[in-house]
């Protein structure tokens, strides 16, 4: 791991802002988020605008992890899952279509 990779591993994806003010990435343990109004909630649930809905779907801590992994791998984005089985299911559901077969 070169110096650039070490810097990315430590800092990529996290911006210290006046509202957060944290030097290190906090571990968000909330389960749900507040919506401005019903239109805001509808836009979030329909993916018309980015934001947080429910922590098992996405949260700021996972976002930083995904951004760091993407930076380290030179990618555009990354997906963090809660388990290897979830990673396999996500991959297969993304790549396979009706009628495809898997040989294991």
Regions found by a protein language model. Give the residues of each.
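Structural motif
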Residues: 26-27, 77-79, 100-101
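Conserved PLP-anchoring active-site segment centered on the Schiff-base-forming lysine
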Residues: 94-104
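N-terminal glycine-rich, Lys/His-bearing helix-loop that initiates the first secondary-structure elements
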Residues: 1-49
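Conserved N-terminal alpha-helix of the aminotransferase class I/II PLP-enzyme fold
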Residues: 37-86
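Buried hydrophobic packing segments
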Residues: 87-95
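Catalytic cores of large soluble enzymes that bind and process phosphate-bearing ligands
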Residues: 2, 57-61, 104
């Amino acid at each position: 791991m070169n110096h650039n990779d070490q810097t990315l591993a430590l800092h990529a994806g996290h911006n210290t802002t006046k509202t957060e003010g944290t030097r290190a990435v906090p571990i968000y343990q909330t389960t749900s988020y507040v919506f401005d109004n019903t239109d805001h909630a509808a836009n979030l649930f329909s993916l018309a605008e980015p934001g947080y809905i429910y922590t098992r779907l996405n949260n700021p801590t996972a976002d930083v992890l995904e951004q760091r992994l993407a930076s380290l791998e030179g990618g555009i984005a990354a997906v963090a899952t809660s388990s290897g089985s979830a990673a396999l299911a996500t991959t297969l559901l993304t790549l396979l279509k009706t009628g495809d077969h898997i040989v294991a």
